[in-house]
Amino acid sequence: MNVSAIVVEYNPMHNGHLYHIEKTKKLTNCDALVCIMSGNFVQRGFPSILDKWTKANMAISNGVDLVIELPTLYSLSSAEFFSFGAVSILDSLNIINSICFGSEIGNINALQDIATTLLEEPLEYKILLKNYLDKGISFAKARNLALVELNRDNKIMSENISKILSLSNNILGIEYLKSLLLLNSSIKPFTITREGADYKDENLHEEYSSASSIRKYLKENKNINILKDFLPLEGFLEFKRLITKGYNFSMEDSMINYIRYKYISGYKNLHNLIDVSEGLDNRIYKSLEKNFTYDSLVGEIKSKRYAYSRIGRILCQYFIGFENYDLNSLLKSTPNYMRVLASNERGLKVLKEVKKHSSINIYTKLPKNTNTLLSLDIKATNAYSLLNNNIRFNEDYFRSPTIIKNTIY
């Protein structure tokens, strides 16, 4: 069985994601497609606009065969750990033949070359990186500058690296490749050229609009019909059904009062989070005292050293309660389970193959005794239930995977 995989967030699913699914199937000629998906919180530091079960069902309705949850620890981590969490789970299944991701460059060889350098870290690169970090530059920017300078004698390569590393999907793709190399994985990587608007673009465009633009529209408007051209048909119909039922979309602003209350109540333990360097915790506390919206709060805290998405992830982690866990140890380990959110009949065949070839624990219902990684997911869903009145406290214990039969794909 030729099984391919994709790593997704679907916040929310749009036409660009459908294009990714269709191109992956064509490029890899796979018999089945597995996706590992962020749950109720996503990597840019936002609550997901739709809950993880609704997102998973949409994925199955649009051509995915099996949806696995990416543990929240990884979905709210840097690109490096986000990628490692996803790839390590896929690798441990022992049945995934290929992985396909979107990138702005669409050239797997160029991305592989950079990934190899970053993983091997030659001495000159390490020295350059340290010099830039000592100047107070963010890690991502310092890494880019170090790579460019490392290739300064090759002007064409240097210019290409600078361009490649300025674009988010290229960066994420490099991290997937690094993880595959680190794990010595047999999974073959493919990349497709990303189509459509940049993820930061908040304006709706014909055919391929960004998830950011769709979230902004849903936040500010009631007429869902405008989005018909920007969403897969099944996704659009699901949005209409949810709105009719009174579903409330989870937005980042809805977290702020809870975060401010936690701080006011004396929970000043941000320093326990691994992304919080010395002094950043006090910077955040001061900003919490006077900012009442997500954008104003993050906007005041961010700097050339602290990127917007990093601050957003810290706020989500604080909201959930990550600071009470030994995150360093968790991130150094590999997950020993996969949590199934949804499947079709072909996906059930994939699960049978996993059982034959892997010792990984497969969870369709939560076990009585949960490990730390899984307990963080439960905690995340409970925090998410404060933002989305369609999700109950301890919803993870009530939900089983949706099995969708006779899908057209």
UniProtKB/Swiss-Prot annotation:
Classification via SUPFAM superfamilies: Nucleotidylyl transferase
Positions annotated to bind ATP: 7-20, 102, 169, 194
What does the entry list under GO cellular component?
cytoplasm
Subcellular location(s): the record lists: Cytoplasm
Among InterPro entries, the record links this protein to:
Rossmann-like_a/b/a_fold, tRNA(Met)_cyd_acetate_ligase
Give me any GO biological process, just one: tRNA modification
The organism's place on the tree of life at top rank: Bacteria
Molecular function via GO: ATP binding; ligase activity, forming carbon-nitrogen bonds; tRNA binding
EC number(s): the record gives 6.3.4.-
Q: Please verify whether the record's keywords include RNA-binding.
A: yes
Q: Looking at the keywords, is Ligase present?
A: yes
* Keywords, in A-Z order: ATP-binding, Cytoplasm, Ligase, Nucleotide-binding, RNA-binding, tRNA processing, tRNA-binding
Q: Which reaction does this chain catalyze?
A: cytidine(34) in elongator tRNA(Met) + acetate + ATP = N(4)-acetylcytidine(34) in elongator tRNA(Met) + AMP + diphosphate
Pfam families associated with the record: HIGH_NTase1
Similarity section: Belongs to the TmcAL family.
Q: What does this protein do?
A: Catalyzes the formation of N(4)-acetylcytidine (ac(4)C) at the wobble position of elongator tRNA(Met), using acetate and ATP as substrates. First activates an acetate ion to form acetyladenylate (Ac-AMP) and then transfers the acetyl group to tRNA to form ac(4)C34.
**What is the protein's given name?**
tRNA(Met) cytidine acetate ligase
Which organism is this protein's natural source?
Clostridium botulinum (strain Langeland / NCTC 10281 / Type F)
